[in-house]
């Protein structure tokens, strides 16, 4: 049995299979292009698609978690249309003569670093948002599927962190709990967990590998603990608590 301690977002007990969710570690290549204007056109087309996709996610989130929590997707739309963000992408494409994917990735990294260095907690949270919109744009430019469901069976979802677009694309009926390595009590994952009224932990230092993935897990939201591959005594005690 492995035991990890995190910060509890919402109380309660969840018992089920653990699924480790990992983002694709995308390596964006810097490619010289002959026609920067054509590359800018690709970016503008991707941006239009991205804004439309975020509108769909906003409507979905409104139905599932309410307008207040869905508003983050309107924020993402505004960030995608932000003059500073767009001017940075354009400058990199035209001054360096490179592909749109590289320009978006570089801009996203630069803006995320800027937000992460800020003193205000709210502004630091925006680093994850700018990474999310940049990843969406890169996925569109690459022709990837950005709307696929991320979970197909009931499970405790364990991840490094989860972006708003990732949480809203999950089948809520199959999410037993959220557990993230990073994230704060004010993160989007935490807010969603409270809205869904499911046990959840953030700031939990557990490995995201085969020692956890697929194992039986217990999330104890009362004290911020996750048990991986629990012994029979612990499992019986938690099952009893859940029925009380």
Set out the residue ranges of the language-model regions:
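Non-catalytic, soluble scaffold/interaction modules
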Residues: 1-244
């Amino acid at each position: 049995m492995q035991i990890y301690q995190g910060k509890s977002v919402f109380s309660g007990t969840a018992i089920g299979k653990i699924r480790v969710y990992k983002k694709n570690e995308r390596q964006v290549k810097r490619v010289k292009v002959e026609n920067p204007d054509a590359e800018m056109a690709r970016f503008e087309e991707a941006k239009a698609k991205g804004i439309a996709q975020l509108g769909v996610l906003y409507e979905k989130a409104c139905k599932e978690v309410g307008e207040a929590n869905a508003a983050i997707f309107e924020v993402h739309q505004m960030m995608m249309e932000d003059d500073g963000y767009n001017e940075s992408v354009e400058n990199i494409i035209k001054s360096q003569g490179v592909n749109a994917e590289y320009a978006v990735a570089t801009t996203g990294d630069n803006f995320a670093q800027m937000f992460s260095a800020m003193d205000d907690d709210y502004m630091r949270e925006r680093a994850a948002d700018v990474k999310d919109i940049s990843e969406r744009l890169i996925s569109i430019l690459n022709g990837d599927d950005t709307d696929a469901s991320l979970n197909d069976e009931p499970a405790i979802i364990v991840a490094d962190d989860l972006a708003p677009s990732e949480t809203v694309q999950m089948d809520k009926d199959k999410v037993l709990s959220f557990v993230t390595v990073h994230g704060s009590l004010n993160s989007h994952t935490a807010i969603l967990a409270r809205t869904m009224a499911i046990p959840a932990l953030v700031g939990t230092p557990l490995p995201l590998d085969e020692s956890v993935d697929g194992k039986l897990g217990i999330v104890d939201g009362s004290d911020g603990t996750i048990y991986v591959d629990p012994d029979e005594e612990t499992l019986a005690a938690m099952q009893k608590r859940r029925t009380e």
